[in-house]
């Protein structure tokens, strides 16, 4: 399984050393940009921890536990946001539902009727089914509110024996202090252009090394972003966006309508719509960074800052039409 974790060799060795010395922490916070492999790493770690042989965190691939993950043929996990269902009875996974702004407390401690008798905190405290520990993965840790964080505190402070909790977010700055201070922080760097290009070619996403390198550089180390760039209509989208961004007259209403149409064309899939808008704003960021080399660098810097703010709102689950309208109006000022 570890051979499929590319670009994070140092972190793999760090965990192996800690495990070999019996000093593995009970709570971790994985941080890094979306698409650099944090979640894939977390599942590989879970497979190694739950393996019955536990050989230097290398899953054997043949024990009862490893077979639940796919055995020796396990390469990566088929998950997509909150729709993912854990393949293992001692592995628990939760993430923010697409229609929620925060991680619901019910996922952590159960609803009001079952409070304290359901949810991740309760499940991880129970006796392991396969007698080899438990692992809990909390995706979207950026979206804890105070209520959810308080529900998790006791479990973070006193993890059950043989249990490991892994929280996944994008940066420590987005974590509540009560969460951040109780976890060992593991920072994931963006994938290098060489590593990301090789992955794109290996997966058949890029048809050549040159094409893979081009997308890898534009994606800034994110596999998710590179996949979006590989979409057949990205070049036309970039051309269309550049035409509007360089126009002498900025029509905020028309721009907002255009962007809303591009997002709504993807249907009701909220994560997909959010990724599309993130891609559009990412292309705008690239444009403004290049524009800053021109004479009017101050205006480009202002527009870049407003676009980065819009990206932040997309990641914070703000209503997309509102984000689009606010961005188009903001860019229209001083055009």
PLM features per residue range, with description:
Residues 150-164:
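Conserved catalytic/switch belt of AAA+ P-loop NTPases
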């Amino acid at each position: 399984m570890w051979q499929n974790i590319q670009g994070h060799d140092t972190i793999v060795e760090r965990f192996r050393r800690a495990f070999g010395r019996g000093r593995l922490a009970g709570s971790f916070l994985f941080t890094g940009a979306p698409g650099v492999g944090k979640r894939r790493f977390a599942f590989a770690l879970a497979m190694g921890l739950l393996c019955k042989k536990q050989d230097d965190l290398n899953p054997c691939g043949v024990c009862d536990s490893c077979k639940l993950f796919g055995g020796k043929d396990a390469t990566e996990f088929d998950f997509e946001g909150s729709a993912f269902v854990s393949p293992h009875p001692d592995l628990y996974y939760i993430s923010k539902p697409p229609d929620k702004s925060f991680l619901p407390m019910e996922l952590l401690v159960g609803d009001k009727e079952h409070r304290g008798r359901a949810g991740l905190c309760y499940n991880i405290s129970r006796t392991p089914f396969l007698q080899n520990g438990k692992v809990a993965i909390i995706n979207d840790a950026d979206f804890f509110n105070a209520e959810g964080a308080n529900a998790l505190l006791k479990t973070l402070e006193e993890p059950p024996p043989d249990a490991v909790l892994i929280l996944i977010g994008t940066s420590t700055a987005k974590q509540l202090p009560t969460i951040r201070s109780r976890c060992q922080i593991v920072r994931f760097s963006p994938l290098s252009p060489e590593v990301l290009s090789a992955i794109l070619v290996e997966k058949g996403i890029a048809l050549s090394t040159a094409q893979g390198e081009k997308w890898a550089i534009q994606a800034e180390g994110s596999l998710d972003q590179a996949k979006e760039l590989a979409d057949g209509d990205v070049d036309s989208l970039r051309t269309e966006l550049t035409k509007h961004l360089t126009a002498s007259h900025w029509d905020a209403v028309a721009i907002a309508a255009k962007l809303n149409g591009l997002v709504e064309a993807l249907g009701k899939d909220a994560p997909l719509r959010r990724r599309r808008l993130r891609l559009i704003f990412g292309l705008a960021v690239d444009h403004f960074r290049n524009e800053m080399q021109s004479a009017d660098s101050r205006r480009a810097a202002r527009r870049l800052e407003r676009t980065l703010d819009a990206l932040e709102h997309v990641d914070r689950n703000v209503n997309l039409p509102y984000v689009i309208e606010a961005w188009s109006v903001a860019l229209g000022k001083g055009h």
